[in-house]
Every structure is written in structure tokens, then in C-alpha cells.
């Protein structure tokens, strides 16, 4: 563990993610999106692309992000 933990998300939160490396570049900004059918994901503010497949709950989304942190894919994450 690197001391970084996925935050508890709310729909409409803006999220800054700093990646260790890869196709996403050094850092990207996202917004937590969802609808009445509970399809939650992080939406890239620059491209509009979904970071994850739609999830049933915000807890499921948090778990996916935490797995990326634990696996060293995400270096830093912050809600702003």
C-alpha cells in the first residue's frame, strides 16, 4: 500500500487522477457521472470518454479505482 485510498464518490464530484504511466498521460480530470438507472462511472472532462464500464453502485466504482491504486496504476487521486 502506498497510503493512497479511493475517495467516497458522489455524482457530480470532479476528480483529479495522476497516473503512474500509460496511455492516459500524467494526469487527467474526471467527473463522477450517473443516472436514474444507477450507471456510475468517471467521465473524462477533456474527451467525454468513460474511465470504467458503468457500475451499479458508487461503492463498486470506488472498489475499481482502489484496485487500480493497489496495483500501482494510479499514483494520486483527489476530489476537488
What are these regions (language model features)?
Residues 10, 34-36, 78:
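Generic beta-strand structural signal
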Residues 45-80:
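Intrinsically disordered, low-complexity, charged/polar segments
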Residues 1-11:
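Mixed-charge, Lys/Arg-rich low-complexity intrinsically disordered regions
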Residues 19-57:
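Basic/aromatic-rich interaction segments and small domains that mediate binding to polyanionic partners
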Residues 11-13, 28:
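Short beta-strand or tight-loop elements
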Amino acid at each position: 500500500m502506498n497510503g493512497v485510498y479511493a475517495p467516497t464518490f458522489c455524482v457530480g464530484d470532479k476528480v483529479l487522477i495522476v497516473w503512474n504511466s500509460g496511455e492516459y498521460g500524467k494526469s487527467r480530470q474526471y467527473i463522477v457521472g450517473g443516472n436514474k438507472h444507477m450507471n456510475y462511472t468517471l467521465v473524462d472532462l477533456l474527451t467525454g470518454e468513460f474511465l470504467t464500464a458503468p457500475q451499479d453502485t458508487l461503492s463498486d466504482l470506488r472498489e475499481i479505482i482502489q484496485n487500480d491504486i493497489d496495483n500501482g496504476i494510479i499514483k494520486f487521486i483527489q476530489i476537488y
